[in-house]
Structure formats: structure tokens, C-alpha cells
Regions:
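Hydrophobic, proline/glycine-rich low-complexity stretches
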Residues: 1-86
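Residue-identity detector for glutamine
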Residues: 47, 88-90, 165
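Catalytic strand-loop segment that frames the active site of acyl-thioester-processing enzymes
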Residues: 1-35, 116-117, 128-173
Length: 173
């Protein structure tokens, strides 16, 4: 339960969020399911399919290269047990885009997370930008269909980030 509570504090749980921080009736935040993704970024996945062998994935994913998470989607299928359990996960690179020499590369991945019984817990989809990795001759990044409207936002939210929150997050591993 300690890891689940520490994670909740690290992402901003406060005094009104006892269901995520107090062990008596503890629940795991759904975003706790993103942890398998962060455990595999910059790590060579064991399964490269469905990429063709011609892709130079070894040149893109290197532990010395910094990266930027461009987007992340998590689909939850069941709650995460906050007390005990083991994740089994499969990380698949679904696409690699070459932005050109000096412009980086973009890698799209899917991670299926299962519990010990093999039941799906969640699926993570992400897009990661590796700024030092472009120019390998891969397919170009498709243009975005997103249109940003020229108007005021629907709503705005001011939030507080504790001065120690970054330390708590790093302590989660």
C-alpha cells in the first residue's frame, strides 16, 4: 500500500483524498496504471512487431537519449489492487516517424497491462519524441487533424503544486 499512497501524494493528493492515501480503505489512482509505461521508455522492448525489420529501432531507443512525452492515453479495464499484485505487461512499438536530420524522431507505443491471472488491467498508448534521433530515413510524421479554435477557453483551472511534489514523484521510482 505504501507505493500506492506515495504515488498519490506525488501526483498531488491532498487532505481530502484519503481514499488514495489512507490504508484502511485505500484505492489506487487510475493513473497508477501508467507506471509500466515509464518503466519501459528508453528500454529496448522485447517485441518489435509490427514494425518492419528495416526500421532502425536500435538507433532510436538509446538510454543516453533524452525524450519528451508528447501524449499519453490510458484505458482502464478494472481497478488496480492497492495492496498486492504483479503486473505482466507487453510493450509494442506501433509506429516510428522520422522528422529529419536534427529534427528528431517520434515513437508510438502500446502497452497492455495484465494482472497475475492474465486479465487486462489497462492499456497505455503514448507518443514519445526523441530529439536526437532523426535522419534515419523512416516515414515522415503525419500532419495533425487537430484544429485549435480561435476563441476563449471553455474553462480555466488554477492549481497548486507543492514545493516538495517533485521530490515525492522521484521517490516513487
Amino acid at each position: 500500500w505504501r507505493d500506492v499512497a506515495l504515488y498519490a501524494l506525488a501526483v498531488g493528493a491532498g487532505r481530502n483524498d484519503l481514499m488514495y492515501t489512507y490504508e484502511k480503505y485505500l484505492k489506487a489512482l487510475p493513473t497508477y496504471g501508467t507506471i509500466p509505461y515509464w518503466g519501459t521508455v528508453n528500454v529496448r522492448p522485447y517485441q518489435w512487431m509490427p514494425l518492419p525489420a528495416s526500421m532502425l529501432a536500435d538507433e532510436i531507443i538509446k538510454p543516453t537519449i533524452s525524450f519528451l512525452n508528447m501524449d499519453h492515453e490510458i484505458i482502464m479495464y478494472r481497478p488496480i489492487d492497492p495492496i498486492k499484485g504483479t503486473f505482466q505487461y507487453q510493450d509494442v512499438i506501433t509506429d516510428v516517424y522520422d522528422r529529419g536530420e536534427g529534427k528528431g524522431a517520434v515513437v508510438k507505443t502500446r502497452i497492455d497491462v495484465r494482472d497475475e491471472a492474465g486479465n487486462m488491467v489497462c492499456t497505455n498508448y503514448s507518443t514519445t519524441f526523441f530529439h536526437e534521433a532523426g535522419g534515419f530515413g523512416g516515414k515522415p510524421m503525419p500532419k495533425s487533424d487537430v484544429v485549435i479554435p480561435d476563441r476563449e477557453p471553455d474553462f480555466e483551472l488554477d492549481d497548486y503544486i507543492s514545493p516538495v511534489q517533485n521530490l515525492l514523484y522521484r521517490l516513487t521510482g
